[in-house]
């Protein structure tokens, strides 16, 4: 069929060009050549063949690593699984963002899981961006393996941690939070004399000393002092620089920023947690998986790594109860409760 089309075009060309042989032959060759090439090209089948060969070679390579170098294979498989998880989450976040734009849905009106996914993905991608960029060129993922081996906690996000590393690193990060506890409690005690009401001063002093001596506070005791956190000296816009730096460490935010940026970041992050609390109350704590439950407790200040589901649910119910009772102007109390509600909870459940 194609060769017939080439002959037909040749006769038309001879008729139009006349008796000029050289021009006619050149035209015949140019017209025939594309028809000749198009009959033999099979790019799609070649690409699929190459892809299948590459997949087979990769599977053989993975089996070889698993047999000969099991420790390295663990790093390799962790990285590949983590990268796929990250790409899957990126697609899900893209769909959520697209729906927000098309339907005009603000962040605080999203369902809990979508809100939490956006919050966590934003923090993950900031930390993972350098590693992802490094891994794009061919064979550059071997450099990533070196980084995974020597600096997994500092450079990699949770997707690229092994289960053992995840547990170990969460403990390390929480110990970093605990180091800021004394400074935060001392800051609260130093603020007590500046409170105007005598009864409020007594309640605040009693609350702080109880926490310092190992007592876990009740929600009622915390709510009783909420007015102290709506204005000076403990309101969100009245905290001193040292207190804001200590609270930033508890929230895993860098403390090495000017005061106005520390205040802005603390305010935006605790507001984000309040929005998550509202969405979680609608969903219900019982609807969370164990992993979601432990993560929800951890970002609110509790080291939930070694706790049972029941203990996590008890603590999270207390947090949500207090959060639902507070006004927006009292957000500073919720921020301080990352210490007040978490410092002695483990000891209280052991007693």
From Swiss-Prot:
Pfam families linked to this entry: LETM1_RBD (PF07766)
All ranges on the Mitochondrial intermembrane side of the membrane: 152-351
GO BP term, pick one: mitochondrion organization
Origin: domain of life: Eukaryota
Coiled-coil regions listed: none
One GO CC term on file: nucleus
Residue numbers on the Cytoplasmic membrane side: 1-130
PANTHER family: LETM1 DOMAIN-CONTAINING PROTEIN 1 (PTHR14009:SF13), LEUCINE ZIPPER-EF-HAND CONTAINING TRANSMEMBRANE PROTEIN (PTHR14009)
Protein name: LETM1 domain-containing protein 1
Organism encoding this protein: Xenopus tropicalis (Western clawed frog)
PROSITE patterns given in the database record: LETM1_RBD
Domain Letm1 RBD: 172-351
Subcellular location as annotated: Mitochondrion outer membrane; Nucleus; Mitochondrion inner membrane
TM region positions: 131-151
Keywords from the named record: Membrane, Mitochondrion, Mitochondrion inner membrane, Mitochondrion outer membrane, Nucleus, Transmembrane, Transmembrane helix
GO MF annotations in UniProt: ribosome binding
Membrane topology of the entry: Single-pass membrane protein
Function: May play an essential role for mitochondrial structure and function.
């Amino acid at each position: 069929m194609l060769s017939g089309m080439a002959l037909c075009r040749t006769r038309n060309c001879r008729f139009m060009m006349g008796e000029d042989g050289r021009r006619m032959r050149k035209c015949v060759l140019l017209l025939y050549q594309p028809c000749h090439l198009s009959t033999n090209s099979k790019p799609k089948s070649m690409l699929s063949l190459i892809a299948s060969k590459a997949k087979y070679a990769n599977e053989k390579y993975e089996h070889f690593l698993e047999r000969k170098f099991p420790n390295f294979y663990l790093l390799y498989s962790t990285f590949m699984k983590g990268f796929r998880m990250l790409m899957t989450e990126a697609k899900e976040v893209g769909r959520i963002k697209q729906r927000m734009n098309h339907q005009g849905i603000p962040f605080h009106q999203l369902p809990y899981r979508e809100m939490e996914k956006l919050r966590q993905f934003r923090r993950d991608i900031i930390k993972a961006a350098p590693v992802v960029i490094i891994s794009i060129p061919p064979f550059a993922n071997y450099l990533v393996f070196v980084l995974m081996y020597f600096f997994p906690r500092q450079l990699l996000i949770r997707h690229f941690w092994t289960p053992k590393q995840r547990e170990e690193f969460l403990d390390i990060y929480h110990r970093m939070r605990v180091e800021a506890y004394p400074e935060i409690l001392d800051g609260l005690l130093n603020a007590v004399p500046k409170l105007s009401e005598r009864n409020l001063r007594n309640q605040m002093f009693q609350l702080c000393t109880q926490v310092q001596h190992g007592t876990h506070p009740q929600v009622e005791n915390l709510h009783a002092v909420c007015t102290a956190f709506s204005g000076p000296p403990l309101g969100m816009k009245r905290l001193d620089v040292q207190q804001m730096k200590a609270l930033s460490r508890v929230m895993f935010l860098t403390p090495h920023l000017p005061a106005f940026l520390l205040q802005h970041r603390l305010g935006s992050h605790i507001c984000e947690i309040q929005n998550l609390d509202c969405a979680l109350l609608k969903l219900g704590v019982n609807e969370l998986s164990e992993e979601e439950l432990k993560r929800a407790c951890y970002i609110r200040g509790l080291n939930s790594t070694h706790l049972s589901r029941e203990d996590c649910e008890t603590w999270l119910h207390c947090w949500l109860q207090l959060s639902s009772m507070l006004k927006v102007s009292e957000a500073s109390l919720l921020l301080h409760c990352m210490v007040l509600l978490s410092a002695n909870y483990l000891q209280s459940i052991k007693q």
